[in-house]
Amino acid sequence: TTYGFTIGGPIIKNKLFFFANGELQNTPAIANRWRASEDGVANADAYISRATVADLQKVSDIAKERYGYNTGSFSSFPSDNKNTKLLARIDWNINNNHRLALRYNYTKNTVWNAPNASSMDGGTRMSGSRTSQYAMSYANSMYSLDNLVHSLSFDLNSRFSATLSNQFLATFSKLDDVRGTNSSIFPFVDILKDNQNYISFGEELFTYNNAVHNTVWNIKDDVTYYTGNHKIMVGLNYEHQMADNQYLRNGTGYYRYTSLDDFVQGAAPEIVCLTYGYNGENEPASRVQYNKLGFYLQDEWNVRSDFKVTAGLRFDGLFFDNGDLMTNNAILDLDYNGRHIDTGKWPGNSLTVSPRIGFSWDILGNNTLKLRGGSGLFSGRLPLVFFTNMPTNGGMIQYQAQVNAKNAKDKGFTMDEFKGGILSTEALKQKLYDLGYPQTIKPEDGTVPSSICGVDPDFKMPQVWKSSIAVDYTVPVSFPLNVTVEGIYNKTLNAAMLKDWSQKDINGFTRFNGADNRPVFPSDATYTDEAGKSLPSAYMLENTSRGYGWSTSVTVNAAPAKWINLMAAYTHTVSKEVTSLPGSNASSVLNYLSTYEGVNNFRLHNGLNVTPDRFIASATINDKSGNHFSLIYETWRGGYNYSYMLANDINGDGYNYDAIYIPTDKQVADGSFRFVSEDDKTRFMDYVHNDSYLKNNQGKYAEPNSLYSPWVHRVDFSYKHDFNLNVCGAKHKLQLSFDMKNVLNFFNSSWGVSKHLNPAIGNEARILKYEGVDAEGFATFSTPESINGNTKTWTLNHAIGQCWYASIGIKYCFN
């Protein structure tokens, strides 16, 4: 449901004007489609989980009776998305030479989400999601993403003479991204069954005190001067940006039990985690702020009437403020193979130079055939959350306690300390204090957290070299018919990536025998301190120059009659990168990308957010009777991009994000790729032969983000009718509208619906399981029962956003 208004008009005739627009939208959605089973048997096609009604009710009752916690329903979940927008603008014609525009924007967007699929700390991440055929969670474990934006702008345009003009633009933006929940403060609890997620409850483990607050000031002044056949523009730009990041993963506590019986009996949990602020601070925050000063100049040179060259040069200086940081000397003393991490310093001041040149050539001199293009360096930004990861995980603001059997033993206790049930957040914090975990910290002493984040002192903001070439052709027919062919190429110069400095180089590691000969990480794969204790993971933000991309597009525009406009366009896109930075937490970004040689050895792969093929066509009709028709057809491939992976950790690096090797038929036949049984081999190879990606990439490791969802086809229709009215001698207009999205779906529920990964395969494409190494050093594999030659890779995505919907509108324009 959408409600909106638009109003505008003069405050002072021909001098001062106002405009306002508001919209309130409430969109039905389904954030969790899964439901509990009666018999413990999952049915992925029907979105029935193996988690039973009886077990879910038992856990909910125990949570209420034993701990006073309300889990919420396991059959009804919050889901509706809400969006509120407001725009207000004042335009002032000060005089003939000066115009001022003031604008205010407000946006609030709320979207509900199921709990994080499987991320956790202190142990092995499960392959099955917490809401899936394997597991269920409760309504109060859902969370909302609330995006709030306030922005103001002051835009003054001045003309001082026929050859000299100026634009002064100042903007202020306040952007707040926060999480909401219906849960009371309570630890998040995972209960496993058969070494897989089964039931989860509590406040979502990444929601408490999770917010990013960005404040941005931007001021620029551009002077434009015309002289002869040159248009020269010179400008200055100043930007100040500050980000406060609040991020307490496991901020209310985290428990993981290996079985339902362990939870019911109050047995020792497998893992306990808590992140807390020092000195009793319940809402710790980390801050990064920088100043950016830019100077740029550009010359548009009309060399001839049919040939124009545009050349420009931009200088950007970036200056970080170290005043919000403290060096953790305990971290600084750690020796990562001769490298040390100073969490009290941002990257040094840097200067980026970006030259650019472009041209436009009217080849025939009559605007019927144009060649245009350009090349240059372009700089961008990086979300500041990747910087605030350093103070957040620098051990000076908050402490991340991750307790399991191994590190408990290192500290001189056992997991039996946590027998007897779940402690409240405050009681758990006190328990950790009693076990020797720090309550306060001094910079000169410092402490070593479970994991560390840092930024390379020489880190630079992203920069690419971009080149393009295009041809615009007007076809010599009796009506306007234009064709444009364009190609764009991008080469990465500086992109952001993460590396774990604690990991040793894989050169020299033992490898499996056979076709899948990936390295095997030994027990001493990480660097150690002088006492022989493994150093914590050190996630370092660095630069890489690896990566490129290109796209080609063809666009046709035609107007065969005055009352109709036609358009068609096709775009093919390729993007290769080292990482898409999926997420905001450093460990998630690094560890949750499929690889076969470990987290520091990513190969170039397809970008996560790429739609490789897209075609769109439209027809717009406007007749003399006030009727306006619009028909849009769109089809694309991709949008849901997956990576074929193993169900478990084959290389021993501690992360279950290992790409599968796709064997050839010969490698399977001659035993260089081995299965534990003939049945596993037959079912897997039958699936390979029936899946186009696997079949076309046999003999290779599966590339991340390369399993693209199939083509989807959509048609949208719009009709508007204008009623011209004469009210008290003034011309008014009343417009009625009818819009229908995804028209095909109205006629057939499977038409116009995109496809995503078949739930029978899982929410991640894990189609093989490592079963150990045989006596000859070959890795052996089994195939999940759901995988065979008849298994469909894709299934219809039954989501509200895939359905048709229609809207009726009314608009009244008056003078």
List the model feature ranges, each with a label.
Residues 484-643:
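Gram-negative outer-membrane beta-barrel transporters
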Residues 1-5, 84-88, 148-154, 170, ...:
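Hydrophobic, lipid-facing positions within transmembrane beta-strands of outer-membrane proteins
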Residues 2-114, 144-172, 355:
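Transmembrane beta-barrel wall of Gram-negative outer-membrane proteins
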Residues 434-446, 626-728, 735, 760-798:
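Extracytoplasmic gating/loop element in the C-terminal half of outer-membrane beta-barrel translocons
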Residues 324-354, 358-540, 710, 728, ...:
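Solvent-exposed loop/turn elements at secondary-structure boundaries
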Residues 20-24, 102-106, 168-174, 234-240, ...:
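Transmembrane beta-barrel strands of outer-membrane/channel proteins
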Residues 12-15, 97, 162-163, 225-231, ...:
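Short loop/turn motifs that connect adjacent beta-strands in outer-membrane beta-barrel proteins
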